[in-house]
């Protein structure tokens, strides 16, 4: 299912989430199962299915990583069940540095500063990756789409690393 079509939106990585939310509410009102309380059983089931599709579509398009995965899947690149890893050696080295810095937070003289530094570093890197992804994901060229897929993999890693940083931060305070 093409969620962009469901929400009458142009397929774009850079999406106006306010418009998405407005369309979501409109669709929810139109297909909500309560509107079909006196309908046939088949119509009730269809309403429940449509509501589930609308909810899935909204949750997919609302988040940049899942939106990018959806855009790539529409072009034949499915990242949802893959175990492919990033092969970019510079990224892997940066990843190791970040992991070491995360492990050393509790031993730092100033854990607050270390945490702030990592937040800043993650944010800058994420911004760079997101900008590159926005440029590449609209392409129809297979090699460029593979580059976009690698960028999505990096963003997924960054999400995991961000969650680890937040857990480390919570453990300290």
UniProtKB/Swiss-Prot annotation:
Keywords: Chaperone
InterPro entries per record: DnaJ_domain, HscB, HscB_C_sf, HscB_oligo_C, J_dom_sf
Residues in J domain copies: 2-74
One Pfam family of this chain: HSCB_C
GO molecular function terms attached to this record: ATPase activator activity; protein-folding chaperone binding
Swiss-Prot/TrEMBL GO biological process terms: [2Fe-2S] cluster assembly; protein complex oligomerization; protein folding
Chaperone as UniProt keyword: yes
Keyword Chaperone recorded: yes
This protein's GO CC annotations: iron-sulfur cluster transfer complex
NCBIfam families associated with the record: hscB (TIGR00714), PRK05014.1 (NF003449)
Physiological role: Co-chaperone involved in the maturation of iron-sulfur cluster-containing proteins. Seems to help targeting proteins to be folded toward HscA.
Subunit relationships: Interacts with HscA and stimulates its ATPase activity.
Protein family per UniProt: Belongs to the HscB family.
Protein name: Co-chaperone protein HscB homolog
Gene: hscB
């Amino acid at each position: 299912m093409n969620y962009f079509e469901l929400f009458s939106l142009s397929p774009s990585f850079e999406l106006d989430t306010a418009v998405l939310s407005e369309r979501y509410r409109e669709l929810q009102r139109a297909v909500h199962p309560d509107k079909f309380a006196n309908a046939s059983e088949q119509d009730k089931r269809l309403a429940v299915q449509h509501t589930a599709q609308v909810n899935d579509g909204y949750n997919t398009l609302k988040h940049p990583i899942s939106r990018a995965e959806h855009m790539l899947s529409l072009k034949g690149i499915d990242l949802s069940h893959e175990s492919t890893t990033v092969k970019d050696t510079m990224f892997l080295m940066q990843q190791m540095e970040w992991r070491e810095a995360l492990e050393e937070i509790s031993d730092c003289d100033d854990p607050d500063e270390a945490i702030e530094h990592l937040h800043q570093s993650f944010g800058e890197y994420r911004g760079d990756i997101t900008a590159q992804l926005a440029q590449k994901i609209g392409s129809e060229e297979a090699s460029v789409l593979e580059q976009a897929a690698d960028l999505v993999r990096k963003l997924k890693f960054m999400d995991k690393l961000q969650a680890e940083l937040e857990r480390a931060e919570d453990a300290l305070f």
